[in-house]
Amino acid sequence: MAKVLVLYYSSYGHVETMAQHVAEGAKSVPGVEVTLKRVPETIPADQAKAIGVKVDQAAPVATVDELPNYDAIIFGTPTRFGNMAGQMRTFLDQTGCLWMKGALVGKIGSVFASTGTQHGGQETTITSFHTTLLHQGMVIVGVPYACSGLVNMSEITGGTPYGATTLAGADGSRQPSANELDIARYQGKHVAELAVKLAS
């Protein structure tokens, strides 16, 4: 049984929605156990509520120590100036103990993201995230062009060969589109299929 963790941070629910669909795609693969978790919020609760952060997310909070239990980890993050969110960075900065042991070497790592605008850094967020995963010795998996949603030219849409993405709009009012959610499901399924092969 291959174990897949979908681990995300979401301020306003866009990445949370994407994460749920990534997990859905992974669950469609036989022989896979899928876990959906989030990283801890670092903004004090009163401040988070004041700025509209979605604090009532159902996914439980992950710990660094549990990461080696999975064969694949699919990370989700909003973009912060072309990089991952600080909450995800803070979580990953605590994985030095895992790096020392080589605990994540050979495990699959994959990333999906959200941005406020069409050219708001979705690709740089994912590719810069890959650097951390490579230092951990993880095997990077993206979204191949076999996923037809990547070549959809009929609408403004997220989605890259590096990973699924969604465009939230500068004010956060845009929700993930059907095409973006299809790509998210594809990414989850693709990673899960590879995890099964590596675990066998």
From Swiss-Prot:
Family that this chain belongs to: Belongs to the WrbA family.
Free-text remark on how the cofactor is bound: Binds 1 FMN per monomer.
Protein name: NAD(P)H dehydrogenase (quinone)
Keywords noted in UniProt: Flavoprotein, FMN, NAD, NADP, Nucleotide-binding, Oxidoreductase
Cofactors (names): FMN
Binding site for substrate: 99
Residues given in the record as FMN binding sites: 10-15, 79-81, 114-120, 135
Organism of this sequence: Burkholderia ambifaria (strain MC40-6)
GO molecular function ontology, one term from the record: NADP binding
Residue ranges of domain Flavodoxin-like in the record: 4-191
Entry EC no(s): 1.6.5.2
NCBIfam families reported for this sequence: flav_wrbA (TIGR01755), PRK03767.1 (NF002999)
Example of a GO cellular component annotation carried by this entry: membrane
PANTHER family in the cross-refs: FLAVODOXIN-RELATED PROTEIN WRBA-RELATED, FLAVOPROTEIN-LIKE PROTEIN YCP4-RELATED
Reaction(s) catalysed by this chain's protein: a quinone + NADH + H(+) = a quinol + NAD(+); a quinone + NADPH + H(+) = a quinol + NADP(+)
Binding site for NAD(+): 12
